[in-house]
From Swiss-Prot:
This is Erythroid differentiation-related factor 1. Transcription factor involved in erythroid differentiation. Involved in transcriptional activation of the globin gene. The lineage of its organism: Eukaryota, Metazoa, Chordata, Craniata, Vertebrata. Keywords: Activator, Nucleus, Repeat, TPR repeat, Transcription, Transcription regulation. The keyword Hydrolase does not apply. Changing L95F: In a colorectal cancer sample; somatic mutation. Changing N45S: In a colorectal cancer sample; somatic mutation. It is found in: Nucleus. Residues 1-38, 220-268, 517-561, 620-647 are annotated as: Disordered. The keyword Acyltransferase does not apply. InterPro entries: EDRF1_N (IPR056582), EDRF1_TPR (IPR056583). Coiled coil: none annotated. One of its GO terms (cellular component) is nucleus. Residues 530-547 have a biased composition (Acidic residues).
């Protein structure tokens, strides 16, 4: 039995298992193969049974010694009551196999096989209890059992009423139960002593077993001491046979567990309940279980020889058994029994033997018959034959029905975890009652008078802990785990068990995943999934004997209102599925796991607070702590910026912070409360504080997403205060915790930045920041016991100064980055590292823009002084430094797009510097300065770097287009300034013209007029303006230049080309009629200038004709102006129509009037010159129909124009209408003349 194979995992069923019967081992199999079980048919009734030995402490099986006939069993063998390896560790106490179980035997097994409790197994109990339950319909004996529910598992233990009431007489602990029992069940209870026959049978059985393992078959005299102990056993065993019941929640003294201590004949007292460390419970590292079993144990040992996972039909049971099993030779596994030949085997005995063999998977039974202690014969009986023995006939199918009904009854009614239920049947009664002892106990003065409370609480905790530690545990069980822990907490007194309470609260907080949004789950758990399966376990009793005396029955069972449920007749248990349909399984109290972020975090914090209270209450040095009232709000200190020193003061605070972080790496430790490092209080408080910091971080992140920035800052402040306390307590900072801190500071930086950008709602943010819940105050009070919590005050103050907020945000990101440098966190968390550097680059851009805008504001306020102030220069330096650092941040993570944006902003800063250096004196004397040129060229360099950073437009088209536009603007601005304020004192005119031309052409290069975008009209306007300026420049050069005819011709061609391009581009725009008109008038002037150098009338007429064509093409511009004036004229409902027409807000009225006057004069001049030339030509030539038509048309138009211009009262709109009309006639006349020629 001691082979390692016995503890192996259950294997697949073989053989006839698929056929659904019951199988036992054949003669050639050993017990180790029992895990393979299959099926056997018993008397025509199919009953499936499967037994897997999960643990065995028995020695290797040996054959029993077959005693010679006439051996006198009344004589003690030489080895009697001495420890024997063949009988295992229970050798000296076995007294046969009728040893009583201990009050908490199921708990010992549950602790050892914690994986099975709550889910896989229906019942955990001693085999004797199982047998006693299954014999209820057949037996008149009393039944008294304690029932506890853990998940879907029931724990059954014998509740020895006689033992309890004897204790009550001595200590008064169970007075309430004794009074209840006497009132409702037996009014005249008195202790019943066991008969001499009972002790005779136990002694003769014990001697028989020792003879069987001795092997010599001889009776040998024993010492007088042994005889005395045998004779005294009848008096002593009554008190010592079972375990002593402990006073509720007493810490026990140490009790010897050495088996040799009881070798004098009496059974040993079990040690008071000290739950040892359970080696078989899984201990995984993913959940820190800070509860030390040994410190709060109540000695619940699993001391069964073997623990068996027994499946009886659909009922799964974990059963403890001490039955000796013999083997060897022809019989590899047999059980050994002693029977009086004069007493036939009855049904109770048969069921007893059959169940023992089924549970232990023993195929055969060897029966030794005796008469008056004299051995007569041996008989071999197969297990499957036991139900058909003479005088012992019973139906295995009925036994199966009984088992299923009892389990269904118990599961339907024992619904409250943590409650102790009492299943009771009086001797000779047919009524079975179920009481809730916990409810009855609560009616007494001290509700902790239940000795089951502590073992149940520990088991609830252990099951929950075991479920939590399984990495593959589905989250649907979290509701079950929470229920287990809450029920555990209900059972415990806060003042007596702070460690368990703190640990359970910590585990409750661990149930809620804070790092990701919780998806909605149905809280389906083992507690909600009670099946009608049932397994019950009984301890072995001597059939037909009533060891505890007789119990009278109540006169009317229906009068018992205290009972939770009643089986009115034990005969009902034999009816198939009697209780499956009648007793509905009540839903468990499994709480759904919430999925709202704030609710989840608040629940976590409530558990953390309870845990912290438990820890704090257990620390004795209360008098050494500063007084604090949890109900008094702890002020969140708010310092004025002047006292804190602004952004400059942050440098010193950051240095102190980084020095502190460095010291943590060296393992420094400081606590104000005097906690001892390594103590459970220290370990637990560390974990609880860390959990609170995580919860506050998640709350802050959630508030941030809701744009509640004041609330977010309050939560991140609490998170950092928690972390600061953690740092004070921690002796060895884990990299994971440092990563948390880096994340907290990153979020804090985000919040400070958003507060800076949302200054208009500052009052609301300030109110949210200063609000505190009572829960937050109490947590903070606990934190203040260990630390001042001021380590991160520099990061969490709500400032009213924009610069300070931006600086604090930047310092938060810098601190987060510094933390990543302390260990290998940077390489281990590349995503977080990239995010931190992105934020550093972004905040430095924000600060750079802030200083740049301040510099621009100072510049705009500067009126007379031409020199740049020191304040401006200082702001430039700060801005440039921020941009430079930000660019480095983005380049280090290869973020080309953001690097390009910062390079673009640096270019803008250079342009502001250039603008600051322009002369502010007399505009007429101003020249483009070298400083302006220097800064504009620097700006161009930064824009070109930005383009090189992006590489191609495909990477980020919007940024690419923006940089191109800024670059084009810079070239255009520089060229315009050089053209308008030519530095003639330093450079020759030709050089200036060359530089202007080059800059304008480069501006055109980066001005994309073809791509369709929102910026396209601006690009078209910019390009048209550049062409106009270039044309004007070449026009001016042509006017001023003499000599070099080749150069003059070149300038003439360039001017005409650029005028033409400018006109085409302005023609595309709907909102630039004045610009188009100006370009066309300049083109006319250019034509007039050309005409002055012409000598022939033909050439002049050609030039005049081209000029008039240009005039005709201005009709589009006048139509745009006309349309706009008409639209504006129609808007006013009353008033002067002329005033309304002239008061155009979108048109520059003066500009239009000026251009209109010039246009009228030039048109008049061109028409007059045309008339003169055509008239002189007509005198020299005749029959020129075209010229006659043109001359006639021009005269008619000229006369109309003169009359129109003579009318000084005409409105702008009327004058525009005339021009449009005349231009239409001019265009028609030209077309008519062309047709006439054809």
């Amino acid at each position: 039995m001691g082979d390692a194979k016995e503890a192996g995992a259950e294997g697949p069923p073989a053989g006839a298992a698929a056929r659904g019967g019951l199988s036992l081992l054949s003669q050639g199999e050993s017990e180790e193969s029992s895990a393979q079980g299959s099926a056997l048919f018993l008397g025509g009734n199919e009953v499936k049974s499967r037994a897997v030995v999960k643990y065995s402490s028995a020695p290797p099986r040996t054959a029993f010694a077959r005693l010679e006939e006439k051996t006198d069993l009344k004589l003690p063998p030489a080895n009697w009551l001495r420890e024997s390896a063949k009988l295992g560790p229970a050798g000296t106490t076995i007294l046969g196999n009728s040893k009583k179980s201990k009050p908490f035997s199921s708990f010992g097994m549950a602790y050892d096989f914690i994986d099975s409790v709550g889910n896989d197994v229906d019942v955990v109990s001693d085999s004797e209890n199982i047998k006693k339950l299954l014999k209820i319909p057949y037996s008149k004996s009393h039944v008294s059992m304690a029932v506890h529910r853990i998940g879907r598992t029931l724990l059954l233990d014998e509740l020895d009423i006689q033992e309890l009431f004897m204790r009550s007489s001595q200590t008064g602990d169970w007075t309430w139960l004794k009074e209840f029992y006497q009132r409702l069940i037996d009014q005249k209870w008195q202790r019943k002593k066991k008969s001499k026959e009972h002790w005779y049978q136990k002694a003769i059985l014990s001697k028989f077993l020792y003879y069987s393992i001795n092997g010599d078959g001889a009776a040998q005299p024993v010492s007088s001491t042994a005889e005395q102990q045998e004779s005294s056993s009848s008096d002593q065993t009554n008190d010592s046979e079972g375990a002593s019941w402990p006073a509720p929640f007493e810490m026990p003294s140490s009790v010897s567990e050495d088996p040799s201590a009881s070798s004098q004949g009496s059974e040993p007292l079990e040690p008071s309940y000290i739950v040892g460390h359970v080696a078989s419970a899984p201990k995984e590292q993913n959940l820190i279980t800070l509860f030390n079993d040994g410190e709060h144990s109540q000695g619940l040992k699993n001391d069964f020889v073997r623990n068996i996972l027994w499946t009886f039909e659909d009922i799964h049971m974990l059963v403890g058994s001490n039955m000796p099993i013999f083997g060897g030779g022809r019989y590899p596994a047999v059980s050994l029994r002693l029977r009086d030949n004069n007493k036939p085997i009855n049904v109770l005995t048969g069921i007893d033997y059959w169940l023992d063999n089924l549970i232990c998977n023993v195929p055969e039974l060897v029966m030794c018959f005796h008469v008056n202690g004299i051995v007569q014969k041996y008989e071999m009986i197969k297990t499957e034959e036991i139900p058909n023995l003479e005088n012992s006939n019973f139906s295995t199918k009925v036994i199966k029905d009984i088992a299923q009904n009892i389990l269904s009854f118990l599961k339907s009614n024992c619904t409250k975890e943590g409650h102790t239920y009492w299943l009771f049947k009086a001797s000779g009664s047919d009524i079975v009652k179920l009481y809730d002892l916990t409810t009855l106990c609560e009616e007494t003065e001290d509700k902790y008078q239940n000795p089951f409370t502590m073992p149940v609480a520990i088991l609830l905790y252990k099951v929950a802990c075991n479920m939590m530690m399984k990495k593959n545990q589905n989250k649907k069980h979290y509701g079950t785990i929470r229920t287990l822990l809450l029920n555990c907490l209900k059972l415990l007194d806060k003042s007596r068990h702070p460690q368990i309470i703190a640990s359970a609260n910590y585990m409750l907080s661990e149930l809620f995943q804070l790092d990701e949004p919780k998806k909605e789950e149905n809280s389906e758990s083992p507690l909600n999934e009670n099946s009608d399966e049932s397994y019950s376990e009984e301890e072995e009793e001597m059939p037909d004997s009533d060891e505890n005396g007789s119990y009278s029955t109540s006169s009317d069972p229906s009068d018992d209102s205290k009972a939770v449920a009643i089986i009115k007749s034990v005969g009902e248990l034999s009816v198939p599925e009697k209780y499956k349909s009648i007793h509905q399984i009540r839903p468990s109290c499994a709480f759904p796991v919430c999925h709202d972020t704030e609710e989840r975090c608040r629940l976590v914090l409530s558990y953390v607070l309870e845990g912290l209270k438990s820890v704090d209450s257990s620390i004795k040095k209360e008098s050494d702590l500063p007084a604090a009232d949890p109900s008094t709000p702890i002020p969140l200190k708010y310092e004025d910026e002047s006292s804190r020193g602004g952004p400059e003061g942050l440098e010193k605070q950051m240095a102190l912070f980084l020095d502190k972080m460095g010291s943590l790496q060296k393992g420094n430790y400081s606590s104000q409360s005097g906690m001892i490092p390594g103590s459970w209080q220290h370990k637990m408080k560390l974990q609880l504080i860390l959990k609170s910091s995580k919860a506050y971080y998640v709350l802050s992140d959630a508030a941030m997403s809701l744009q509640k920035y004041g609330r977010a800052l309050r939560y991140i402040k609490l998170a950092l205060q928690s972390h600061d306390t953690y740092c004070c307590l921690c002796t060895n900072m884990l990299s994971e915790v440092l990563l948390f801190l880096s994340q907290y500071l990153t979020l804090c930086g985000d919040i400070q930045l958003m507060l800076a950008q949302n200054a208009n709602n500052r009052a609301a943010h300030l109110e949210e920041f200063h609000y505190q819940t009572k829960e937050d105050q109490e947590i903070l009070h606990s934190l203040h016991r260990e630390s001042s919590c001021q380590g991160f005050a520099w990061a969490t103050d709500l400032s009213t100064d924009l610069e300070s907020q931006l600086s604090v945000s930047c310092k938060c990101y810098e601190a987060a980055n510094e933390i990543l440098q302390f260990s290998d966190l940077k390489s281990q968390n590349p995503e977080h590292y990239v995010q931190v550097l992105k934020r550093m680059g972004n905040i430095r851009n924000e600060i750079g823009v802030f200083y740049m805008n301040q510099a621009a504001a100072l510049q705009s306020e500067r009126l007379v002084s031409k020199s740049v102030s020191a304040a401006e220069q200082q702001l430039w330096k700060k801005s440039f430094s921020c941009f430079e650092k930000g660019i480095h941040n983005f380049e280090s993570i290869e973020d080309a797009t953001n690097a390009a944006l910062l390079l673009c902003n640096t270019g803008r800063l250079m342009r502001i510097c250039a603008q600051a250096h322009c002369g502010a004196g007399d505009e007429l004397k101003r020249e483009f300065s070298p400083e302006e040129g220097l800064y504009y060229n620097k700006a161009i360099d930064y824009y070109l770097k930005a383009l090189r950073s992006l590489g191609t437009r495909d990477i980020h088209p919007a940024v690419w287009d923006s940089v191109n536009w800024e670059l084009s603007t810079t070239y255009f601005t520089m060229a315009t300034l050089q053209q308008d304020y030519a530095p003639l004192s330093r450079k020759a005119q030709e050089q200036i013209e060359k530089e202007v031309s080059e800059a304008m052409m480069k501006s055109l290069k980066y001005c994309d007029v073809d791509s369709v975008s929102a910026r396209q009209p601006l690009c078209q306007y910019r390009a048209a303006t550049i062409h106009h300026r270039l044309a004007s420049m070449y026009h001016s050069c042509l006017r001023n230049q003499v000599g070099d005819e080749h150069l003059r011709k070149q300038h003439r061609v360039l001017a005409d080309l650029h005028y033409s391009k400018a006109a085409k581009l302005f023609q595309l725009l709907k909102d630039a009629p004045c610009e188009l008109l100006r370009v066309q008038l300049e083109r006319v002037a250019f034509a007039e200038f050309q005409m002055t150098s012409q000598n022939s009338n033909v050439g002049k007429l050609k030039t005049l004709s081209g000029a008039l064509d240009i005039m005709v093409r201005t009709e589009h511009a006048f139509q745009l102006i006309q349309k706009e004036l008409i639209e504006e004229f129609g808007q006013p409902k009353s008033g002067d129509a002329a005033a309304a027409a002239d008061a155009s807000p979108s048109l520059n009225r003066e500009e239009v009037m000026k251009l209109l006057s010039i246009f009228e004069s030039r048109l008049s001049f061109l028409l007059l010159q045309s008339i003169k030339l055509l008239s002189s030509t007509k005198k020299k030539t005749s029959n020129n129909i075209e010229d006659d038509t043109i001359l006639k048309t021009n005269k008619h138009i000229y006369s109309q124009l003169l009359r129109a211009t003579a009318n000084k009262t005409a409105t702008l709109l009327e004058r525009i209408n005339v021009i449009v009309h005349l231009l239409g006639q001019l265009a028609a006349g030209s077309a008519a003349s062309s047709n006439a020629v054809q």
